[in-house]
Curated annotation (Swiss-Prot):
The keyword Hydrolase applies. It catalyses: (S)-allantoin + H2O = allantoate + H(+). Zn(2+) 1 binds at H97, H99, K185, D360. Binds 2 Zn(2+) ions per subunit. GO terms for molecular function: allantoinase activity; cobalt ion binding; zinc ion binding. This is Probable allantoinase 2. Homotetramer. PROSITE patterns: DIHYDROOROTASE_1. Its cofactor is Zn(2+). SUPFAM superfamilies: Composite domain of metallo-dependent hydrolases (SSF51338), Metallo-dependent hydrolases (SSF51556). It comes from Dictyostelium discoideum (Social amoeba).
């Protein structure tokens, strides 16, 4: 019976994608024209031709579509708009680290609100983590539950990760070949979700052995293994010491001291050793926070170890010194660290050690932050849920930092779009403006600033560590596969045309 559910699930996905394309009249030629298009590492004037949701032509800015002698639609033309000479057109953002929390914890977030927030932020693709939903995505059966929960809710395209926990390595093959997951994630310490326990070295080896078999037997592309890289012992020792010292749990420094860099450093060292021995399965460090780990990652990469790392919007913008007393909206794991640490992370981004920037969007309810909705309550950092909501704000957060540092705007495309799409194997269709790729774009004004108003965000729980902050880079329009899904001023994302993304070459059709 289960195999028929598998066949039906894959058939439904393909049929749904076909119907969505037909419904949106994608066969009609569409044109985007702009003076400032990020293309091949440059900002140049271009005309972009779109059909069936794909970019089919890249022409000079002066190109006249009337010469093609067919009906066409102008999606965007900066010559027909006022005061937009500075607007940038870029490939839609890809956020490969998002916690959507559906099914089971939709009071935290959900596919409707998360994908709406993504669209409003210029993000056209997100990848959902496997642990904060209930059930967690650690089996093929649970994966089908998540797929079912997505139907009729997606405003942007969504890929899924599976989870690796002790004893579930035999689920890997089915989740990849029949479920189409883009990769897997594990924790080296308790995740905070009882159903998603940490793995040890034997568990990792078992999982890697399964992935080796997949790669060798089916001649398939690499399936990434992602790790939350902290070990527990240094954290437990630091927490006991701080409690014995009666350290104030409402002071952010107390939480920061409870999560020392050595916890990350030791975990990453262990993962480098395992990956070096394995050499076939690629591993990826999610949300790198400790600057002390940068050098060992760089050395391993230079030695040919298949390992990579990401960092987050939060670690590149926020600092521990600026966290207000008791404001647990700033709590994440690993933690936001000192200004000096932030600068070293930026150095690693600029020199290419860290190749992508993501949100690690991890929302929850206000009570789990040990706060109330009066905006005046004081929270306990040691008890509050760790996670910062930033999915909608990534483009302006990182552009504000780049603008202040004199970093070219073209780097946004590499760090926020192309890098994440490569990580999860979607760069054949996502991540940049190229002929044959999905016609996903964000149009924004890099010179316009705004003040973050948390109540106007599309998130389900409308509170933010960025509330009241001035950021540069206002998103004016988001386009998904040639369809405009968001325009500045929209208070609801009405088009539900998002699709589940799979590695089509990994689906076993035999």
């Amino acid at each position: 019976m289960e195999i028929w559910k598998v066949i039906f699930s894959i058939w439904f996905l393909l049929f749904q994608n076909f119907v969505l394309s037909a419904k949106n009249d994608d066969n009609k030629l569409k044109v985007i024209r702009g003076r400032n298009v990020i293309y091949n590492g440059n900002v140049i004037p271009l005309s972009i031709l779109i059909r069936n949701g794909k970019t089919i032509g890249i022409k000079d800015y002066s190109f006249n579509p009337k010469k093609l002698n067919e009906n066409y639609e102008i999606l965007y033309d900066d010559r027909e708009c006022n005061n937009n000479e500075d607007f940038i057109i870029m490939g839609g953002l890809v956020d490969s680290h998002v916690h959507v929390n559906e099914p089971g914890r939709t009071e935290w977030e959900g596919f409707e609100s998360a994908t709406s927030a993504a669209a409003a932020g210029g993000v056209t693709t997100i990848v959902d983590m496997p642990l904060n939903s209930s059930p967690v995505t650690t089996s093929f059966k649970n994966l089908l539950d998540k797929i079912e929960s997505m139907k009729g809710k997606l405003r942007v395209d969504v890929g899924l990760l599976g989870g690796i926990v002790p004893g579930n390595s035999k689920e890997i093959k089915k989740m990849v070949l029949q479920g189409g997951v883009l990769g897997f994630k594990s924790f080296l310490l308790p995740s905070g979700i009882d159903e998603f326990p940490p793995v040890n070295e034997n568990d990792i080896q078992e999982a890697m052995n399964e992935m080796k078999l997949l790669k060798c037997q089916y001649n398939n592309s690499d399936v990434i293994m992602m790790f939350h890289a902290e070990v527990e012992e240094p954290i437990k020792e630091a927490t006991v010491r701080l409690k014995n010292e009666n350290a104030d749990p409402k002071l952010y420094k107390t939480y920061l001291d409870s999560r020392p860099k050595i916890s990350e450093n030791q975990a990453i060292s262990k993962l480098i050793d395992i990956t070096r021995q394995n050499q076939i399965v690629s591993t990826h460090i999610v949300h790198l926070s400790s600057s002390e780990s940068i050098e060992q990652i760089r050395e391993a990469m230079d030695q040919g170890v298949p390992i990579s790392a990401e960092t987050t919007y939060n670690y590149l913008h926020l600092t521990s010194e600026s966290v207000p007393y008791g404001n647990t909206l700033f709590k994440s794991a690993p933690p936001v660290r000192e200004h000096e640490n932030k600068e070293l992370l930026w150095n690693a981004i600029i020199n290419g050690t860290i190749k992508l920037i993501v949100s690690d969007h991890s929302p929850c309810t206000i009570n789990l932050k040990q706060l109330k909705e009066d905006n005046q309550s004081i929270g306990d950092f040691l008890k509050a849920w760790g996670g910062i909501s930033s999915l909608e704000l990534g483009l302006p957060i990182i552009w504000t930092e780049c603008k202040n540092r004199g970093i070219p705007i073209t780097q946004l495309s590499e760090w926020l779009s192309n890098g994440p799409s490569k990580l999860v194997g979607l760069n054949d269709r996502k991540g940049s403006i190229e002929i044959g790729r999905d016609a996903d774009f964000v149009i924004f004004n890099p010179n316009e600033s705004f003040i973050v108003n948390e109540k106007k965000l599309f998130l389900k729980n409308k509170f933010s560590a960025y509330n009241g902050e001035k950021l540069f880079g206002v998103v004016y329009e988001t386009i998904l596969r040639g369809n405009s899904i968001f325009k500045k001023g929209d208070n609801k994302i009405k088009k539900i045309i998002g699709q589940r993304l799979i590695k089509s070459n990994l689906i076993n059709k035999k």
